[in-house]
């Protein structure tokens, strides 16, 4: 991830934690140290996904990050809700009208275009 991606993710985490009282936000960059081995990082992320009730997937970029795509599919297969966040104005889907790859888009309960819209959708699901 780029420094800008990491900073954006940290901003999203802080935004949600400041506004949602009963929510604990898992942030992948805090779950396992970067110095950890591949298996350790994978297992830590898998544990966090299994413990989570709701997922926010950052979908910006010309293509959804490979790891994010895997996590969205895994989470969706467990019957849990994924809320996408795509602030990128570019379209990355291969189908007309799709914002991202159709498998990702259809796995998301919703895709928000701003933090405020994401917060509103989360509040409706949680409270």
Where are these regions (language model features)?
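Conserved catalytic or regulatory cores that recognize and/or transform ribose-phosphate-containing ligands
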Residues: 1-127
């Amino acid at each position: 991830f780029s420094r800008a991606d990491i900073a954006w993710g940290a901003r999203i985490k802080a935004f949600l934690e400041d506004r949602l009282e009963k929510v604990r936000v898992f942030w992948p960059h805090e779950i396992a140290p970067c110095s950890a081995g591949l298996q350790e990082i994978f297992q830590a992320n898998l544990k966090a996904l299994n413990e989570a009730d709701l997922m926010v997937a950052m979908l910006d970029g010309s293509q959804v990050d490979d790891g994010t795509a895997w996590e969205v599919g895994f989470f969706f297969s467990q019957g849990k809700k994924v809320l996408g966040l795509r602030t990128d104005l570019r379209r990355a889907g291969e189908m007309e009208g799709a914002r991202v790859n159709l498998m990702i888009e259809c796995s998301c309960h919703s895709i928000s275009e701003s933090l405020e819209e994401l917060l509103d959708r989360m509040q409706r699901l949680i409270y």
